[in-house]
Structures are given as C-alpha cells and as structure tokens.
C-alpha cells in the first residue's frame, strides 16, 4: 500500500484540511479522494504522494 495525502480545497483553492489515506495505486487513491471530497464541504481536492501531485480536481460550478 502507498500513502497519499488528500488536501481539501476551499473556493479560493486554498487547502483547509488534509486527510491521509493508504491505497494500492494512484487510480484507487483518486476514487477514494473523490468520495471523501463529495462528503465534505470542499470545493475540490489535491491528491499528493510525497512531493508528487498525483491529481488536482477543483469543483466546477
């Protein structure tokens, strides 16, 4: 398992909360981050593994 950090973004795209998660691969981590973001007040998220930005998904309105 690999460790990832999901940074929840506010409407100005600043991180207001960080949640760790462990997943088998990037694809699984992106799915998990989407689920966590959908169940929060976030306006998007960034997914990081160490210093690598795996995925960034700001919400579009």
How should each PLM-predicted stretch be described?
Residues 14-19, 51-55:
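Surface-exposed loop/edge segments in extracytoplasmic proteins
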Residues 1-17:
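Short aromatic-glycine-(Arg/Gly/Cys) micro-motifs in beta-strand/loop hairpins
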């Amino acid at each position: 398992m690999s460790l990832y950090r999901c940074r929840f973004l506010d409407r100005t795209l600043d991180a207001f909360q960080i949640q760790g998660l462990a997943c088998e691969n990037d694809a699984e981590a992106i799915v998990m981050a989407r689920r966590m973001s959908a169940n929060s007040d976030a306006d998007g998220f960034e997914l990081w593994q160490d210093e690598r930005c795996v995925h960034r998904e700001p919400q579009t309105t």
